[in-house]
Amino acid sequence: MAKKSMIAKQQRKAKFSTQAYTRCNICGRPHSVYRDFGLCRVCLRKMANEGLIPGMRKASW
């Protein structure tokens, strides 16, 4: 879980464009965030398995 101070810091507008970074919209995790969904891999997998993301399903081959 992300610290509240880091989440608040991330929500401010960055002074320079290179300082901006992505965080998960659900848990605030800074790493392995999918930009298309705005979710980290953990939350993306959980929501996909619960059927909360339309059109996404578990792969099987």
Curated annotation (Swiss-Prot):
<dbReference type="GO" id="GO:0003735">
    <property type="term" value="F:structural constituent of ribosome"/>
</dbReference>
<keyword id="KW-0699">rRNA-binding</keyword>
<comment type="function">
    <text>Binds 16S rRNA, required for the assembly of 30S particles and may also be responsible for determining the conformation of the 16S rRNA at the A site.</text>
</comment>
<dbReference type="InterPro" id="IPR018271">
    <property type="entry name" value="Ribosomal_uS14_CS"/>
</dbReference>
<feature type="binding site">
    <location>
        <position position="24"/>
    </location>
    <ligand>
        <name>Zn(2+)</name>
    </ligand>
</feature>
<dbReference type="Pfam" id="PF00253">
    <property type="entry name" value="Ribosomal_S14"/>
</dbReference>
<dbReference type="GO" id="GO:0006412">
    <property type="term" value="P:translation"/>
</dbReference>
<dbReference type="InterPro" id="IPR043140">
    <property type="entry name" value="Ribosomal_uS14_sf"/>
</dbReference>
<dbReference type="GO" id="GO:0005737">
    <property type="term" value="C:cytoplasm"/>
</dbReference>
<feature type="binding site">
    <location>
        <position position="43"/>
    </location>
    <ligand>
        <name>Zn(2+)</name>
    </ligand>
</feature>
<dbReference type="InterPro" id="IPR001209">
    <property type="entry name" value="Ribosomal_uS14"/>
</dbReference>
<comment type="similarity">
    <text>Belongs to the universal ribosomal protein uS14 family. Zinc-binding uS14 subfamily.</text>
</comment>
<comment type="subunit">
    <text>Part of the 30S ribosomal subunit. Contacts proteins S3 and S10.</text>
</comment>
<keyword id="KW-0862">Zinc</keyword>
<dbReference type="GO" id="GO:0015935">
    <property type="term" value="C:small ribosomal subunit"/>
</dbReference>
<keyword id="KW-0689">Ribosomal protein</keyword>
<dbReference type="GO" id="GO:0019843">
    <property type="term" value="F:rRNA binding"/>
</dbReference>
<keyword id="KW-0479">Metal-binding</keyword>
<keyword id="KW-0694">RNA-binding</keyword>
<dbReference type="GO" id="GO:0008270">
    <property type="term" value="F:zinc ion binding"/>
</dbReference>
<feature type="binding site">
    <location>
        <position position="40"/>
    </location>
    <ligand>
        <name>Zn(2+)</name>
    </ligand>
</feature>
<feature type="binding site">
    <location>
        <position position="27"/>
    </location>
    <ligand>
        <name>Zn(2+)</name>
    </ligand>
</feature>
<protein>
    <recommendedName>
        <fullName>Small ribosomal subunit protein uS14</fullName>
    </recommendedName>
</protein>
<dbReference type="InterPro" id="IPR023053">
    <property type="entry name" value="Ribosomal_uS14_bact"/>
</dbReference>
<keyword id="KW-0687">Ribonucleoprotein</keyword>
